[in-house]
């Protein structure tokens, strides 16, 4: 391992020699052969920031202006908490991570080259978030509170150890009432025979308020010096209420007259939660403490709900009102959606050293996963509120997965050389049943053999060279598969595809690390490709009478229909860099950035897009007189391309001040702000097809400011002792959540 990156405001060595205080700084970044670790706990900004904000500093991780997270340049990655996979976080990283305070986190690992013991999914890699509490014993309790221009929050962490039993608990609550957001879109239709319906324009605004809760309870019992039992229970989630309104107008070619226009009013409530529990039993060999076997069981449930009402108002022109309602299906509706993923996992892992140089690890796992979706759709004729159940527009199905896997890995460590090859076998048995709505029941059975290899070489005492190859797979998640026909906006329709197959990706990486007392650097070069990527496809409905889909669903002429398919071929090459300069014992300057070139193709759809993207984030941390800590950060990105268009660039800046008081710095105060010069910030997206061009912009609240306070009591000397091996499920394609109607994320 190599340590790089030092924090300027925390003292880890204090020797008083003739009245002079000699100060050294704690390392923030640690590099191993297959991962990079960022020490959140020792970064002063963690006292006031969310986990999402802290991720901007983590090497190999980027967060764009709309808070979308990427690892190694890919939005397909997995998130673990304390070594255990968390599908809810993986599916909703933006929503979850920006709601969780960073002061509950000890460090974040970026596992760049997952070995054979990890499930074969996660193209970008794995983020392992480790919570506070490791390496101490005794008792402690910390109480936290915060307030900002969007809401308030509070939390507590407590730990107690008595004899062989250790228990820790953590709970946080945040209430959020964000300012109203705005969006607008423009689409031009290139079809020559519809000049009176050529330009579609819409604008809308929305507002939401709700709460986010996060809590966990962990306990461990040392049966004796060789046996350890660990039990954990956790939950987090959110419930909110929202309302939105919008205007839609279809212009002719001359932009003077309109074919139709209408208003919409929508209000609803929703919730999403993740509830999990696990138990691990670890047995260590009496002769060799490095030889151990672990038995693990995990259960996880992820219920989500969405209940909304949509009303169409002021439909014009009056003389064609009935025809417009019929053509566009502008009937007031009530949508009541429920989804849930229930998962049970059984796992055994065995590790044994062979001599002083070699280590063998092997294991097996069985996962039973049950995805269920029940979307009920009710319609009202005309302007009434007499809603009637419409079975044709409703959907209910069950998606069962049986996943069996086994792995074997080998590690050789000789002086400064490390070599880690591995092989994993996975078999997946799928069963899909439709209870309501379109679709036929089907079964599928497929298997994958997944190789991996990584190696590291120490080049002297201060330099390290690492390289590796990984094959990764992604199984489509419930949001990609759900066949629910989402036409809440009749001109922007989305639907999942239950026939999706797993996508496979191959990646090669090479990295170099160097550190001295002043300068620290990590460079990582990565190339990846896949030939059956799951991509979102959008096309314009060109039939003058509209298009009928399975189940009798109709998309009107001029609507943009989006779904998913295994149509993508991608080639991506990226360079990540992390630079840290310890200008003085009280000053730290850092830069974290990435440059990436992408080539995206879909021969079947005759689509091709390519281009560069770059992002950088940096800052300075300074200890001022009076032990006041100053943190100034900023960064930005160029637009990132997609298969059918590109997004928007962004810029970001923040300022924070913190001060600790009392003996052992038990009381901490923090004030912070970001983007204070602009209340709103606009992000643009551009999409093109064979017969249309679509542009959209979203205006989000940007200005943010607030303060936080925390107080610690008790003596902390040890924490929960955890099993060295536990369950890691990395096998669901993430990033598709955020809604409850499945198919796509609508416009």
Give residue ranges: language-model regions.
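Short acidic/polar hinge/loop motifs at secondary-structure boundaries
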Residues: 51, 57, 84-112
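N-terminal periplasmic "start-of-domain" segments of outer-membrane beta-barrel proteins
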Residues: 21-46, 69-80, 84
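Face-selective signature of the C-terminal outer-membrane beta-barrel domain
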Residues: 214-222, 226-238, 266-433, 458, ...
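Surface-exposed extracellular loop regions of Gram-negative outer-membrane beta-barrel proteins
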Residues: 429-431, 461-506, 527-556, 676-690
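N-terminal periplasmic accessory domains that precede
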Residues: 9-10, 19, 23, 51-54, ...
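Outer-membrane beta-barrel translocator/receptor signature
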Residues: 120-127, 135-185, 209-213
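Single conserved hydrophobic/aromatic residue that forms the stacking wall/gate
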Residues: 2-13
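Outer membrane beta-barrel strand-and-loop segments of large Gram-negative receptors
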Residues: 343-347, 388-395, 495-497, 501, ...
């Amino acid at each position: 391992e190599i340590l790089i990156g030092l924090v300027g405001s925390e003292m880890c060595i204090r020797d008083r020699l003739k009245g002079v205080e000699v100060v050294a700084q704690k390392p923030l970044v640690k590099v191993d052969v297959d991962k990079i670790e960022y020490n959140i706990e020792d970064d002063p900004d963690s006292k006031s920031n969310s986990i999402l904000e802290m991720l901007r500093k983590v090497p190999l991780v980027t967060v764009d202006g709309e808070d979308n997270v990427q690892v190694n340049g890919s939005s397909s990655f997995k998130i673990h908490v304390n070594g255990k996979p968390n599908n809810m976080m993986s599916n909703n990283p933006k929503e979850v991570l920006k709601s969780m305070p960073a002061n509950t986190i000890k460090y974040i690992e970026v596992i760049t080259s997952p070995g054979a013991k990890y499930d074969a999914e996660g193209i970008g890699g794995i983020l392992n978030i480790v919570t506070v509490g490791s390496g101490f014993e005794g008792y402690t309790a910390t109480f936290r509170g915060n307030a900002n221009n969007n809401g308030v929050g509070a939390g507590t962490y407590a730990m107690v150890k008595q004899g062989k039993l250790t228990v820790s608990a953590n709970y946080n609550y945040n209430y959020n009432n964000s300012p109203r957001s705005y969006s607008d879109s423009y689409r031009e239709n290139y079809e020559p025979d519809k000049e009176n319906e050529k330009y579609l324009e819409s604008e809308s605004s929305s507002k939401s308020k709700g709460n986010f809760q996060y809590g966990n309870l962990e306990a461990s019992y040392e049966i004796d010096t060789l046996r350890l039992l660990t039990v954990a229970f956790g939950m987090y989630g959110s419930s909110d209420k929202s309302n939105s309104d919008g205007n839609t107008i279809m212009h002719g070619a001359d932009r003077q007259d309109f074919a139709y226009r209408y208003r919409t009013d929508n209000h609803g409530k929703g919730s999403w939660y993740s509830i999990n529990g696990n138990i691990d039993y670890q047995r260590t060999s009496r002769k060799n403490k490095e030889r151990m076997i672990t038995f693990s069981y995990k259960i996880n449930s992820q219920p989500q709900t969405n209940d909304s009402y949509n009303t169409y108002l002021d439909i014009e022109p009056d003389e064609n009102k009935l025809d417009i309602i019929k053509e566009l299906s502008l009937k007031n509706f009530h949508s009541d959606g429920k989804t849930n993923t229930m998962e049970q996992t059984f796992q055994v892992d065995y590790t044994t050293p062979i001599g002083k140089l070699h280590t063998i690890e092997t294991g097996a796992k069985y996962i039973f996963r049950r995805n269920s979706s029940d979307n009920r759709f009710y319609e009202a004729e005309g302007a009434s509120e007499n809603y009637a159940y419409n079975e044709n527009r409703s959907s209910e199905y069950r998606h069962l997965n049986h996943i069996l896997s086994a792995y074997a890995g080998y590690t050789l460590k000789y002086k400064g050389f490390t070599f880690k090859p591995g092989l994993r076998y996975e078999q997946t048995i799928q069963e899909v049943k439709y209870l309501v709505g379109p679709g036929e029941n089907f079964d599928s059975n497929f298997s994958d053999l997944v190789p991996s290899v990584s190696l590291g070489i120490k080049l002297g005492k201060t330099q390290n060279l690492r390289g590796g190859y990984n094959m990764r797979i992604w199984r489509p998640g419930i949001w990609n598969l759900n066949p629910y026909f989402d036409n809440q906006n009749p001109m922007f329709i989305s639907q999942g595809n239950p026939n999706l197959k797993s996508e496979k990706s191959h990646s090669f990486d090479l990295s170099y690390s160097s550190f001295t007392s002043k300068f620290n650097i990590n460079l990582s070069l990565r190339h990846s490709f896949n030939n059956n990527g799951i991509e979102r496809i959008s096309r314009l409905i060109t039939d003058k009478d509209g298009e009928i889909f399975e189940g009798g669903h109709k998309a009107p002429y001029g609507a943009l229909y989006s779904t998913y398919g295994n149509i993508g071929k991608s080639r991506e090459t990226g360079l990540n860099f992390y630079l840290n300069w310890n200008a003085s014992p009280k000053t730290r300057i850092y830069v974290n950035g990435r440059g990436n070139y992408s080539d995206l193709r879909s021969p079947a759809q005759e689509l091709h897009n390519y281009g560069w993207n770059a992002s950088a984030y940096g800052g300075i941390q300074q200890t001022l007189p009076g032990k006041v800590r100053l943190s100034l950060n900023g960064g930005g990105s160029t637009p990132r391309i997609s298969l059918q268009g590109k997004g928007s660039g962004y810029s970001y800046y923040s300022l924070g001040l913190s001060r600790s008081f009392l003996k052992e710095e038990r009381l901490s105060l923090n004030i912070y702000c970001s983007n204070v010069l602009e209340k709103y910030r606009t992000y643009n997206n551009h999409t093109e097809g064979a017969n249309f061009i679509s542009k959209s912009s979203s205006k989000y609240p940007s200005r943010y400011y607030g303060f936080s306070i925390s107080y610690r009591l008790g003596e902390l000397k040890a924490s929960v002792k955890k099993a060295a091996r536990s369950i890691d499920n990395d096998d669901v394609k993430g990033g598709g959540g955020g809604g409850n109607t499945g198919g796509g994320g609508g416009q």
